[in-house]
A protein has these predicted regions:
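P-loop NTP-binding site
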Residues: 1-78
Length: 78
């Protein structure tokens, strides 16, 4: 389970999208529960990072791309 603020989530997505050691990342999307129990929905590409409140969610983050390095990507969520 990952708990991050909206700012931390934005920064993490941006780093994953721009770190070549993660692979060729096209998109990062999913849901994350904040410390206060509220849900955030993330939908990020290199061109736009959209984070918005969500009424319901499931703790999941999906990284879409080619030649992805799971170990490096997972390190960003710790």
């Amino acid at each position: 389970n990952v708990h991050k603020s909206e700012e931390e989530l934005h920064e993490t997505a941006e780093r994953i999208l721009n770190d070549p050691s993660c692979g060729d990342v096209f998109r990062v999307k999913g849901f994350l529960r904040k410390e206060d129990g509220q849900w955030l929905e993330l939908n990020a590409t290199r061109h736009e990072i959209c984070i918005r409140p969500a009424k319901l969610g499931q703790e999941i983050m999906i990284v879409i791309g080619e030649k992805l390095n799971k170990e490096v990507i997972d390190g960003y969520w710790k």
